[in-house]
Amino acid sequence: MKVIFLQDVKGQGKKGEVKDLSEGYVRNFLLPKKLVKEATDSNVKTLDAQKRSEDKRKEQEKLDAQELGKKLEELTVKVTGKAGEGGRLFGAISSKQVAQALEDQYKIKVDKRKLEMDAIRALGVTQIKVKLHNEVTVTLKVHVVEE
């Protein structure tokens, strides 16, 4: 019996997959637990439409990330911190502070977890990586100045 998986089933298939399974297993176990549905023509067409819309949504997310990445590469974020002799900071500049400064200065919201950086401990310009999407990583300049 052909079925469409509604959820991942260990050892059988992944969500959205169409597979031929034994009728008893499907009727007695998978259907009552709503893990699968029968692969009728209308259900298969619905699944294809869902896959197409999901692909379109993912492509749009990637394009949005690339557009934001172009903006970020041109910017320099200015962050202030207290410093001692030799340009060493008291404490450090964290990803949270950089994300907040980016939002305050340029009205661009970026999640602090997308900033791939170690804590900044010195004055000057530092380049950090920003992972906006699985396939889109850009470099952002952070200029740390003394208060």
Curated annotation (Swiss-Prot):
Coiled coil: none annotated. GO terms for cellular component: ribonucleoprotein complex; ribosome. The gene is rplI. InterPro entries: Ribosomal_bL9, Ribosomal_bL9/RNase_H1_N, Ribosomal_bL9_bac/chp, Ribosomal_bL9_C, Ribosomal_bL9_C_sf, Ribosomal_bL9_N, Ribosomal_bL9_N_sf. This is Large ribosomal subunit protein bL9. The keyword Lyase does not apply. The keyword Transmembrane does not apply. Keywords: Ribonucleoprotein, Ribosomal protein, RNA-binding, rRNA-binding. One of its GO terms (molecular function) is rRNA binding. Binds to the 23S rRNA. It comes from the Bacteria. Residues 44-63 are annotated as: Disordered. SUPFAM superfamilies: L9 N-domain-like, Ribosomal protein L9 C-domain. Residues 48-63 have a biased composition (Basic and acidic residues). PANTHER family: 50S RIBOSOMAL PROTEIN L9. Pfam families: Ribosomal_L9_C, Ribosomal_L9_N. One of its GO terms (biological process) is translation. Gene3D superfamilies: Ribosomal protein L9, C-terminal domain, Ribosomal protein L9, N-terminal domain. Belongs to the bacterial ribosomal protein bL9 family.
